[in-house]
Amino acid sequence: MATNRRDFLKKTALATAGGLVLPTLTYSNMKGVFPKQGLKLSFEPYDLQLKHVFTLANSSRTTTPVMLTKLEIDGFTGYGEASMPPYLGESQETAANFLSALNLGQFSDPFRMEEILEYIDEAAPGNTAAKASVDIALHDLAGKIMNQPWYKIWGYSPENTPHTSFTIGIDEPEVVKQKVEEAAPYKILKVKLGSDNDKEMIETIRSVTDKPLCVDVNQGWKDKKVALEMVEWLKEKGIEFVEQPLPKENRDDIAWLSENAPLPIIADEAIQRLCDVKKAAGIYSGINIKLMKCTGMREAHQMINLAHANQMRVMIGCMTETSCAISAAAQLSPQAEWADLDGNLLISNDPYEGVKVADGKITLIDQPGIGIREI
């Protein structure tokens, strides 16, 4: 039976703040019959090749291990991904062990999303990227069955997507200049800091561009007074905000810095899951939400709503990822003040095609699910 979108959203409760409970719409009444078998989960390891050595405050790498997942039912396939940079504490081996232990075949209705995702989250502690890979695949699958992209299901306007920043990792001056040149289509640059050469990094970039900059210190500064001096200097250089300047455990120092700094201080490592959002309120001006840390789209959606309710701004961010996870995060981007969704732009072997960037702005495509295809 045909239904218009407003009735559909009302029926399924997808437009509510909680987000994903589907009380009346089930796979059985969409298709007329339950499938004979339940959800089929498959996965395979894949290594992302970075275009440049990627250096943060505490590490460098040329590859990022990921796990690519699929969820299938009755001819529909949803795609997911777990990206596991070393600092996340997961690996292809731990992801394989976690995913192998799941019994998703017990679920024959993919619209029982709350029940399915709660089962996955309770299966074992941690493993947030592995959990996100199934969450993303489940959302992609459900969206394909409904023949709608998730930004439409949530009621978001594609016109409200922010510009995405392009990340410049810590490097030698000539390489930094090359990266800035490669980032020509992007309106905002994110600069990784946290080394002894922070001022040189900024001066090098400012010698070749006057674009807006934001910086991510990745907990690289240790002293609050030194951090304040740096933030004051960064403001003079046209920086817009600073991510995680101090170790996340130093809450008192961060609160002092936020009170005295002339720029917004944004939580990155201090934010992983929904329970961390309230802890950040009153200490940070905003939070960076990453699917790989929060178990996926469902919890990220809840975190955005809670952050805004606590007067904090939101950045939707990423790891080094394929277009699969980037396109999943992009479905949420109309509700974010900032986006840092360039992880797929930093690799040379993306196996998917998905969300586009036009003139530095995220462009959502009208394709069902998370809007990707294999290439």
Task: Show which residues each predicted segment covers.
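Flexible C-terminal active-site loop/helix
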Residues: 14, 19, 34-48, 66, ...
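C-terminal segment of N-terminal export signals and the immediately downstream linker at the start
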Residues: 24-56, 62, 72
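Metal-dependent enolase-superfamily TIM-barrel catalytic cores that perform enediolate-based chemistry
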Residues: 150-261
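N-terminal secretory signal peptides
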Residues: 1-4
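Metal- or metallocofactor-binding catalytic centers and their adjacent structured scaffolds
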Residues: 35-43, 72, 77-145
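Catalytic alpha/beta core domains of metabolic enzymes, predominantly
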Residues: 260, 266, 270-341
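N-terminal export signals
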Residues: 7-28
